[in-house]
């Protein structure tokens, strides 16, 4: 463990001991709000301090065993013990490092996921549909609920655009790395020469903000239009003006919802998506101050962000952000997305830990 992290832990232990004393004082106990705040901080610190105390004890044990290595009679036993202690120490340091990382308050929330076809025409729309089904299966593996908010279907199948709300604890934290450009390489069914075509889709992931954090949107900043909902190819599926188009005038953001028969429900859905977009834009502005690696990993949902290539002939999927290729494309499309998300999270946490070390040094 480097000195900067060690100093950080010692500082946290001092704070922990300080709060421990404060929680016995009458003036603190009598102030309900202050007591609640301090108790919450104490509880949060208690876990990391518990591991730190265990780590310090291990350091002493390792030091003692190293002395025993000089004794020929018990050298073999000492080496076994040293191996066990070092393995335990490594696991403890990993746990401590994870606990030291600052929490993203949005990670525990639900999210909206917006998939749009980009370049490649019908093939891009078909791929957008496949991406949605991949996320649907992934959500099912975590028992998250998926609600389709709005769709714009393509004549040849798939979607020009699909927006879904994924409800479940931790959905945003795991899916936030999906924002950006997704490229598919394969031979389309309509290709008679057997040539591989390249198409792209964009994905944007936005946290579903709780009521207390919802971005306030002035009604004067909104332009609301109603129109008749229609299916693929422009066929009318509703004879009333139940579809809603809301334009956020300051940003030019436009949201359409037409999947519900009720105009009121479509409006509620559109406003919730718009609120998430405005909030996500605010987060993106704040994120510009973060390290370049974190900006690359998180993406912005723009097509210029090249996240992955899905190569069907090779059954290969490549994540360009961390230079990772795996030959399990079929499994990933069936929802085994953690094969890619876990390595991304590890890279992200490593970058955050590196930044933490620099700030403490």
UniProtKB/Swiss-Prot annotation:
It is found in: Cytoplasm. Keywords: Cytoplasm, Methylation, Protein biosynthesis. PROSITE patterns: RF_PROK_I. It holds the Pfam family RF-1. GO terms for cellular component: cytoplasm. The modification N5-methylglutamine is found at residue 235. Methylated by PrmC. Methylation increases the termination efficiency of RF1. GO terms for molecular function: translation release factor activity, codon specific. HAMAP family: Rel_fac_1 (MF_00093). Peptide chain release factor 1 directs the termination of translation in response to the peptide chain termination codons UAG and UAA. Belongs to the prokaryotic/mitochondrial release factor family. This is Peptide chain release factor 1. It comes from Buchnera aphidicola subsp. Acyrthosiphon pisum (strain APS) (Acyrthosiphon pisum symbiotic bacterium). The lineage of its organism: Bacteria, Pseudomonadati, Pseudomonadota, Gammaproteobacteria, Enterobacterales.
């Amino acid at each position: 463990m480097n000195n900067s992290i060690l100093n950080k832990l010692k500082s946290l232990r001092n704070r922990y001991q300080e709060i421990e004393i404060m929680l016995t004082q009458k003036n603190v106990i009598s102030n309900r709000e202050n007591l609640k705040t301090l108790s919450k901080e104490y509880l949060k610190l208690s876990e990391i301090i518990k591991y730190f105390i265990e780590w310090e004890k291990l350091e002493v044990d390792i030091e003692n065993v190293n002395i025993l290595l000089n004794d020929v009679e018990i050298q073999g036993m000492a080496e076994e013990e040293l191996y066990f202690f070092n393995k335990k120490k490594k696991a403890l340091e990993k746990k401590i490092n994870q606990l030291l990382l600052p929490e993203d308050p949005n990670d525990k929330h639900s999210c909206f996921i917006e998939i749009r076809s980009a370049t490649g025409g019908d093939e891009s729309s078909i791929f957008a549909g496949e991406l949605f089904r991949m996320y649907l299966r992934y959500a099912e593996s975590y028992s998250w609920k998926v609600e389709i908010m709005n769709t714009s279907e393509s004549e040849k199948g798939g979607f020009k655009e699909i927006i879904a709300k994924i409800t479940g604890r931790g959905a945003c934290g795991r899916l936030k790395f999906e924002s950006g450009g997704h490229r598919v390489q394969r031979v389309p069914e309509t290709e008679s020469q057997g040539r591989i075509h390249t198409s792209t889709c964009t994905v944007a992931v936005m946290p579903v903000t709780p009521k207390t954090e919802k971005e306030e949107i002035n009604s004067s900043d909104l332009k609301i239009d109603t129109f008749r909902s229609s299916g693929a190819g422009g066929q009318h599926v509703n004879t009333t003006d139940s579809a809603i188009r809301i334009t956020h005038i300051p940003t030019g953001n436009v949201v359409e919802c037409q999947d519900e028969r009720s105009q009121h429900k479509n409006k509620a859905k559109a406003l919730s998506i718009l609120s998430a977009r405005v909030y996500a834009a605010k987060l993106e502005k704040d994120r510009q101050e973060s390290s370049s690696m974190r900006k690359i990993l998180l993406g912005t949902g723009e097509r210029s962000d090249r996240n992955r290539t899905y190569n069907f002939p090779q059954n290969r999927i490549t994540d360009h952000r961390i230079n990772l290729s795996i030959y399990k494309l079929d499994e990933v499309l069936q929802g085994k997305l953690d094969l890619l998300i876990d390595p991304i999270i590890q890279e992200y946490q490593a970058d955050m830990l590196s930044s933490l070390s620099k700030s403490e040094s």
